[in-house]
Design a protein with these regions (language model features):
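C-terminal motif of bacterial Sec signal peptides marking the signal peptidase cleavage site
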Residues: 19-23
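Residue-level signal for mature regions of secreted extracellular proteins and peptides
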Residues: 14-17
Length: 131
């Protein structure tokens, strides 16, 4: 009897682990144009990113794990990147967390990636913090 119970518990644990790992959603930025939007204060910028910059962003975002949370970082669709109809809101402070509007989930960049992204967006007129 004990053996049967242990085996059942083992199967349940394995099933829950498989479900957990199989349900992990990852960022997949669509190929093509990425539009940078920065509408803050008196600034109203909507610009297509260069192919090179779009590829940098795509490589940075793709395969990042999406998760549900309520981070304290401030997000707005007025400070965002749009790719293939997907909107990625950039934290208005210096936080390395981004919000995927379409997935209603968040993902993180490393400190180096966050710094690279903010420098890249500076070329398009973005300024941080913008809270």
């Amino acid at each position: 009897m004990k053996r049967c119970i242990k085996f059942t518990i083992f199967l349940l644990l394995m099933a829950s682990m498989i479900f957990t790992f199989a349900s992990c959603t990852k960022v997949e930025v669509a190929d093509g144009e990425i539009v940078a939007i920065f509408q803050y204060g008196d600034v109203d910028i909507t610009k297509s990113m260069t192919h090179e910059d779009s590829e940098t962003v795509r490589k940075m975002f793709n395969k990042k794990n999406l998760y549900s949370d309520s981070p304290s970082c401030g997000f707005s669709e007025n400070v965002a990147l749009i790719a293939g109809g997907d909107t990625y809101c950039i934290a208005c402070d210096d936080c390395g967390t981004l919000y995927s509007v379409n997935e209603d989930k968040y993902f993180n960049l490393s400190d180096k990636e966050n710094e690279t992204l903010r420098k890249l967006l500076g070329k398009y007129g973005f300024t941080f913090p913008c809270v």
